[in-house]
Amino acid sequence: MRYVLCVKQPAYGKQGGFLAYQLAKALLEKGHQITQVFFFQEGVTHGNAFLYPASDEFNLQHAWQRLAQDYHVPLHLCVAAAQRRGVVEPLTSSTTQQNNLASCFVLAGLGEFMKASLEADRVVCL
């Protein structure tokens, strides 16, 4: 089956982001396809390159990046939510010098999320 996941929970402070990662990993290991993970609202914090968890904590951002690389899963951050929360790339910042978008994450609009959702068999929001 083809899945789209949408993540509304922040990278740290709540359990939803980690639960979304666990679900994604389990789906992929069972042979399902994830056509997009869309991070919006507080979920865009997953794509902030300036996240520095303690050395004894699970690094959720690195886990998403490994998942994206290993399974070719697109990690999309809502561009509007990201800008409101200070996550920018050179094209969306006030100057071309600013960039704190983590690798493997891209900024995308709701239209891309809706298109992926319409083409998916299941959409799961956490």
From Swiss-Prot:
- Alphabetically list the UniProt keywords: Cytoplasm, Transferase
Class in the EC hierarchy, top level: transferase
GO CC annotation terms, alphabetical = sulfurtransferase complex
Q: Does the keyword Methyltransferase apply?
A: no
Report the active site residues: 78 (cysteine persulfide intermediate)
The UniProt family comment states: Belongs to the DsrE/TusD family.
The record, for NCBIfam families, names: PRK00207.1 (NF001237), sulf_tusD_dsrE (TIGR03012)
Where does the source fall among the domains of life? Answer: Bacteria
Q: What is this protein called?
A: Sulfurtransferase TusD homolog
Q: One Pfam family, short name please? A: DsrE
Q: Which GO terms describe its molecular function?
A: sulfur carrier activity; sulfurtransferase activity
Provide the protein's localization. Answer: Cytoplasm
Q: What is its EC number?
A: 2.8.1.-
Chief location: cytoplasm
Which terms does the UniProt entry file under GO BP? Answer: tRNA wobble position uridine thiolation
Task of the protein: Could be part of a sulfur-relay system.
Q: Which InterPro entries match?
A: DsrEFH-like, Sulphur_relay_DsrE/F-like, Sulphur_relay_TusD/DsrE
